[in-house]
UniProtKB/Swiss-Prot annotation:
PROSITE patterns recorded: GIY_YIG
Official protein name in the record: UPF0213 protein YPO3475/y0709/YP_0608
Annotated GIY-YIG domain residues: 4-79
Superkingdom of origin: Bacteria
SUPFAM superfamilies: GIY-YIG endonuclease
Family: Belongs to the UPF0213 family.
Family matches, as Pfam families: GIY-YIG
Amino acid sequence: MSDSLWHLYLLRTASGMLYTGITTDVARRLAQHQAGKGAKALRGKGELTLVFHCEAGDRSTALKLEYRVKQLSKQQKEKLVIDQPRLLTTLFLDS
């Protein structure tokens, strides 16, 4: 089991769609997506732009956070892009 620090990221496609994902290396994952070796949802979508990323803790926390962000409306995701909060865990996972 690895203690790697995970990150949550949002990519914007050429058509304006926002894609949410998690990784231990944002630059590597973005390069994979841009090379067509990432998620099928992004293949053939044109240029991809990293518009948001933040630390998400361990893998378990990152997966929970990814799920919560994927449940947000496009408008709420756009607010994340504008506000650029450093930590989302306090917004979404603290009860």
